[in-house]
C-alpha cells in the first residue's frame, strides 16, 4: 500500500487546495456580486448556531429544517468566524475521499486504481467542491454513509450501526438503506439460500418471502438495528427534551410531508405547483412515493450482495424520482461512485457520452430556470419538460451502468502491497 500513499496524499492536497481557493473566492463574490457564492442555507445554519449559543431554540430561525446537532457543530461560526463551518464541510469532503479509498482497497483495487477513482469521481469533481465550499453540509452525511457501508462490509457491525444512526439523524434518506443492509448482513459471509449467482434473489411469492424474513433476523441484523436505533432514539429524545415538538416537526416531519412548489429538477414539481390548493394535493404527494418504493424494493432484493452498488442505485433512484430534487442531492449518490467505478466495464467513449448527457440535461433545465428566476418569464412548462427529459437521461444512465456492471465477491482478495 505504500506505493499508493504518495498518490493519495497528492490527490488530497490538490482537492484541499481547490476547495480552499473556492472558499476564498466565495468571499470575493459575496462582497461584489449580486448573486452570492455562499449557499443561502449557510446563513440559516449560522443564525441557528447563534441562537443556540444564546440558549434559545435554533428553530426560532425561519427555514431551519435540520437537526439541532448541526447548529451545535457550527457554534464556532459565532465565536471564531463564519468560515469555520465551510472549513468543517471541506474537511468532511476530504474525509469522505479517505473512507472511499479504504473501501476500494478492501474490495481489491490497487493503490493507484483506488487513488485514481477517488480523485476523478470525488476529489477533483467540481460538484462536490462547489457544494462543500459554498457551505452545504452534505459532506458530513456522505462520510458517515461511506463509513457505515465500509464497516458493514468489513464486518464491524457495531461501529457501522453507530455511523448509520448518526447519518439517518442528519438526513432521513439513508433510512432507505436499511433493507439492503439487513439483507447483506443476513448471510454473515455466506450466500443466501435461493439467491442467484449474480446476487438476484429467487423465491416464491409467499413461502420464500417468509423464509427470507426469518433468516434476515439474525444476530448481526439485530445488533445493527439495536445500536443504530439506540443512537437515533437517544439523539431524538435529547433534542425533543430540549426543543419539544418543533424539533420533530422541522427536523423529521417536514421532510416527510414536504411539497416544494418552487422549480426544481423533480418531475413532480409542476403537478404539485398546479395542485397546491387542491384537496387532493396531500394524497398526490403521498402517491409520488409509490414509484420510489417499488423500485427501491426491487433494487434491494436484486443487488444487496454488492452493498455499495445497491446503495448507489438506491440513492440515484430516490433522488431522480423524489418530489424535490436539487443539485446538492446529487452528492448523495456521487459519493458512492468512486467505489463502483472499477466494476463498470464500458468503453471510455460510452462513459464520456453518458457524462455529457448528464450535464446536458442539467443545462437544458437551467436555461429556463434562469429566465424564470432572474428575468421573471413564465417558463414553468419548459422547466417541467426539461425535468422530464432529465429523468429519462438519469434512467438511461442507470440502465447503462447496471448492464455494464460486473459484480465481484465482497470478500476482498489479498492485496500484494500491504
Curated annotation (Swiss-Prot):
Swiss-Prot/TrEMBL GO biological process terms: GPI anchor biosynthetic process
Transmembrane segments: 7-27, 80-100, 137-157, 221-241, 282-302, 324-344, 352-372, 379-399
Pathway: Glycolipid biosynthesis; glycosylphosphatidylinositol-anchor biosynthesis
Enzyme Commission number(s) of this protein: 2.4.1.-
Sorted UniProt keywords: Endoplasmic reticulum, Glycosyltransferase, GPI-anchor biosynthesis, Membrane, Transferase, Transmembrane, Transmembrane helix
GO cellular component: endoplasmic reticulum membrane; glycosylphosphatidylinositol-mannosyltransferase I complex
Pfam families: Mannosyl_trans (PF05007)
Gene Ontology terms, MF aspect: glycolipid 1,4-alpha-mannosyltransferase activity; mannosyltransferase activity
Major location (coarse): endoplasmic reticulum
Coiled-coil positions: none
Compartment annotation: Endoplasmic reticulum membrane
Topology in membrane: Multi-pass membrane protein
Cytoplasmic side: 1-6, 101-136, 242-281, 345-351, 400-418
Quaternary structure and partners: Part of the glycosylphosphatidylinositol-mannosyltransferase I complex that is composed of PIGM and PIGX.
Biological function: Catalytic subunit of the glycosylphosphatidylinositol-mannosyltransferase I complex which catalyzes the transfer of the first mannose, via an alpha-1,4 bond from a dolichol-phosphate-mannose (Dol-P-Man) to the glucosaminyl acyl phosphatidylinositol (GlcN-(acyl)PI) intermediate to generate alpha-D-Man-(1->4)-alpha-D-GlcN-(1->6)-(1-radyl,2-acyl-sn-glycero-3-phospho)-2-acyl-inositol and participates in the sixth step of the glycosylphosphatidylinositol-anchor biosynthesis.
Protein name as annotated: GPI alpha-1,4-mannosyltransferase I, catalytic subunit
Organism: Gallus gallus (Chicken)
Gene: PIGM
